[in-house]
Amino acid sequence: MNIDSIFRFKDGIKRYILTAIDYNSGFFFAYGYSHLSSKSGLDFYQKLESVCPFKIKAVQTDHGLEFEKYFRDYLERKGILHFFNYPKHPQMNAQVERANRTLKEEFLDYNLSDLFYNLDRFNQKLMDWLVFYNTKRPHYSLGNIPPLKYLIKNLGFSTMLWTYT
């Protein structure tokens, strides 16, 4: 699982969106925050864990402060491997960077007002978009099927998942 962050700045207000994508299935998750810290990194990871359709065994991040202290300690307690990208090598993050671009083009650019002035509504809309992204939006790299359908088809998941019916 590759985890990254996006930030936006407007009218003296800074907002952050943490993002994560699975290299194999393309499963994508994101959440917006008003500040960036290792506590928000931990909160994001716990939210990711609660919705991820499989057990996360390893994560890859940059050296951002959001991936230190509380985030790092939690991963250690859970026995999850934590790999770091080389500094100033965004190509190590290619898949999450591409997913971030899709997020910006298909969702973020149309919801900037909520990101800055109503973060709760922004995150509610973001969750709706992520459901679409993971269950309905075709992905060329997955044979033009969405990530959760790919998981069901290729990884032996039960077809009783709500997204499959």
Where are these regions (language model features)?
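Mobile-element integrase/transposase regions
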Residues: 1-21, 27, 40-43, 54, ...
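Mobile genetic element proteins and their domesticated derivatives, centered on retroelements
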Residues: 4, 20, 26, 45, ...
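Short small-residue beta-strand/loop micro-motif enriched in glycine and branched aliphatics
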Residues: 27-31, 83-85, 109-110
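Active-site beta-loop-alpha junctions of metal-dependent nucleic acid enzymes
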Residues: 31-53
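Acidic/histidine-rich, metal-coordinating catalytic segments
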Residues: 54-67, 143-148
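RNase H-like polynucleotidyl transferase catalytic core
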Residues: 58-63, 77-95, 112-117
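C-terminal domain-tail junction helix/linker
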Residues: 69, 78, 102-165
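Short amphipathic alpha-helical segments
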Residues: 71-73
